[in-house]
Amino acid sequence: MELEPQYQALRQMHGEDMTLIREKLYEFFSGWLGGPQLFVEKYGHPQLRARHIPFAVNVQVRNEWIACFAQAMSELDIDKALAEPVLIQVFAMADWCRNQNEDGIEPPIPPMAVDPWVRAPELQQILSSYGVNSFFKEFTS
């Protein structure tokens, strides 16, 4: 995010020092992926949507975040059999964090309200628009 100009809107939300952001992200994903509940132990329930209210999270920021996340997974050569299920769930969470009304854009859907895989073609298009083409190739037209 810090090195890629295409993630500028996302980067600007985070301030100069990324140390605490990195730490919280690590702690959150530690628990979310089945490891120690580091985030919960320090901060309580994640309540992701509520924690993101202070930030203007729109479709562009959501797209930059998921593309940046997917790019990192691609650069780390994470196997698609692991990466794709994680990405589709993370995309659903990222969409749920949107808090800006935008003309012509449907409001966010709670992550558990619909099978997230129905949105895989949409996610593939988003990733492709950022040059991240390692995942969801079966949805490429």
Positions of PLM-derived features:
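Core of compact, soluble alpha-helical bundle domains
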Residues: 1-141
